[in-house]
Amino acid sequence: MSPFAHPAFFYRGEDEYLATLLPFVRAGAAAGEPVAVALPTGNLGLIRAGLTSLDPEHALPGVRFVDMALAGLNPGRIIPRILLAFADAQRSRHVRIIGEPVWPGRTPQEYPACLQHEALINTVFRGRDVTILCPYDAEHLPREVLSDARIAHPVVIEEGRERASGPFSVDRALARGNEPLTHPDEARAFEFDDGLLHDARTFAILIASRLGIADEATSALSLTVAELTTNSVVHGGGSGTLRLWAEGDQLVCEVQDSGLLCDPVAGRVPPPVDRPGGRGLLLVNELATLVRMHAGTTGTTVRVYLDMQG
């Protein structure tokens, strides 16, 4: 039996939330297991308060707390920045992590990346001595989200009972998150190849300036465009199309090429230290507030959202 466990926990109300998560944390701490708790801001406060009320003097100081609404705003960086970073530092012991990447208020643009994140946990941590427990607010999340959670998790905990999830399928969950990306008519486009990479960056900064990007945000844009366009030239057929537009306070930068994305964990798992390259999408995930990808049969689209104010 694999030591890896990845249950979804469907909760209804604060009492059920605390009744399941607090014992999970305390049992891990009592066993000397490393424990990380990565939850959206309000729920993180609930767990902190609950642990303090149970043990006012110590409150389990060895537990690591992460605000998922900040560190995990872009779902593409949750695996490398939060989950792998914690688990890789504790390889000699069983690791417990609570991770809540989906909550009421996640936008429709963010959700497909959340679903793919949940599916990829199964791939990235297969065979690892890690338990990653994922709470879902069954009172307030749409029914479709709960259905997707059953597809992305091998086990579901609901109403105090743990059951195998019949619909579980990593491939199906990834496919459901692989939504086609359409761009608005007002998007400004630039066709590039290996001789126009510098021009692509210049074009991006010019358009972004017209759209109102702050000066301190241009370096992130320049790095993003450099990584995406270079990736298209090297791996995506030698050329591509760069598009930019604004959505509210976000600058959207998209690159489309004819390359086929063969590795679904690209940009979410650091390559071995002795392997040159392979870190471009990791960097983009760190810079962005959101990264969406669509892998089709005729090409790949990478869409990056950047804060206009940096």
Q: Which residues fall in each region the model found?
A:
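Conserved beta-strand-loop-beta-strand hairpin that lines the nucleotide-binding pocket
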Residues: 179-182, 230-310
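Amphipathic coiled-coil/heptad-repeat helices and related helical stalk/stem segments
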Residues: 21, 117, 225, 277-280
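Hydrophobic pocket-lining residues that define ligand/cofactor binding sites across diverse proteins
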Residues: 28, 208, 232
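Conserved short strand/loop->alpha-helix "switch" segment adjacent to the catalytic nucleotide/phosphoryl-transfer site
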Residues: 198-226
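Non-catalytic sensory/regulatory segments that transmit input signals in bacterial signaling proteins
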Residues: 1-194, 203, 301, 308-310
